[in-house]
């Protein structure tokens, strides 16, 4: 085939891809001066946050008790600048998608800085709750040799730390950015935690791959999940146009001290009571009483 024939094929593809009907709902109209969220910068934000939350494990390995104040100060300053940039991008993306602004204003820049500083003020509390997650992972796994091994190696800690960062940003009203952050962890670990889920302290996921925690899930303290667990929705109420109604509670509530073993599927707005145990490979769509132990029915001989 001659180069001219190739040119014709390429030109035809360009024309078809440029038809408005072909990109309906898939095209973001970028406006001059509008920043866009950057996955690369958000990855740097996560790494900086981890270096602050887990000093010595991430970031500068030469940090010690004499220099920790300096290193955290430097990282906080970098984090603030990057957060301001990305939060602004999220705010502009959200408002432009809704058709409410053309170019991000000084007011939005000030709001981005306020939200960034508010997020940074939450880091001490975030470290405290992540410390309980590390403790739960260590205490719950006889194969764990140390807290350091848990922090360095366990995919659950990466996924949970991303979730806790994203959840705080979502609680502050930052659009889009929180979802990107949790999906980064999803891609890396296979653990899918929606940033809107509410999760208490001492939370751990053993092994982790294939876990799904839906947006309206509520998880109490000292809860342990194993690989392949789904906390999902049983059904979706529809609006007049037949589309799912968004924002309504549709995922399970797990009370304190619940254990859910591998590949269990728990669906709908049901309650798994305090101290209950859900066995592996079970489909649960009804409330489970406190202290109950739900396992597969044995096959009849």
Where are these regions (language model features)?
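Structural signal for interior beta-strand "rungs" in well-ordered beta-sheet cores
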Residues: 185-301
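Terminal amphipathic alpha-helical/low-complexity segments used for targeting or macromolecular assembly
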Residues: 1-180
């Amino acid at each position: 085939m001659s180069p001219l024939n190739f040119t014709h094929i390429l030109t035809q593809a360009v024309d078809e891809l440029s038809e408005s009907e072909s990109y309906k709902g898939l095209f973001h109209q970028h406006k001059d001066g509008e920043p866009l969220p950057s996955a690369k910068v958000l990855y740097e934000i996560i790494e900086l946050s981890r270096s602050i939350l887990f000093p010595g494990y991430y970031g500068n390995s030469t940090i010690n008790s004499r220099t920790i104040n300096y290193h955290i100060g430097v990282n906080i300053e970098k984090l603030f600048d990057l957060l301001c940039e990305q939060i602004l991008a999220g705010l502009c993306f959200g408002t432009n998608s809704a058709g409410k602004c053309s170019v991000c204003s000084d007011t939005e820049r000030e709001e981005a800085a306020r939200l960034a500083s508010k997020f940074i003020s939450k880091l001490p509390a975030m470290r405290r709750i992540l410390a309980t997650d590390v403790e739960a992972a260590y205490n719950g796994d006889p194969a764990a040799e140390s807290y350091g091994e848990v922090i360095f190696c366990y995919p659950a800690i990466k996924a949970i730390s991303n979730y806790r960062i994203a959840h705080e940003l979502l609680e502050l009203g930052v659009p889009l950015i929180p979802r990107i952050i949790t999906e980064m962890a999803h891609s890396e670990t296979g653990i899918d935690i929606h940033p809107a889920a509410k999760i208490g302290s001492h939370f751990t996921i053993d092994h982790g791959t294939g876990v799904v925690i839906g947006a309206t899930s509520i998880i109490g303290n000292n809860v342990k999940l194993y690989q392949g667990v789904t906390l999902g929705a049983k059904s979706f109420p529809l609006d007049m146009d037949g589309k799912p109604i968004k924002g309504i509670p549709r995922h399970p509530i797990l009370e304190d001290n619940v254990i859910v073993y591998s590949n269990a599927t728990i669906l709908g707005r049901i309650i798994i009571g305090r101290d209950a145990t859900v066995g592996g490979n079970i489909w649960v769509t009804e409330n489970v009483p406190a202290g109950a132990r739900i396992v597969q029915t044995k096959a009849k001989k």
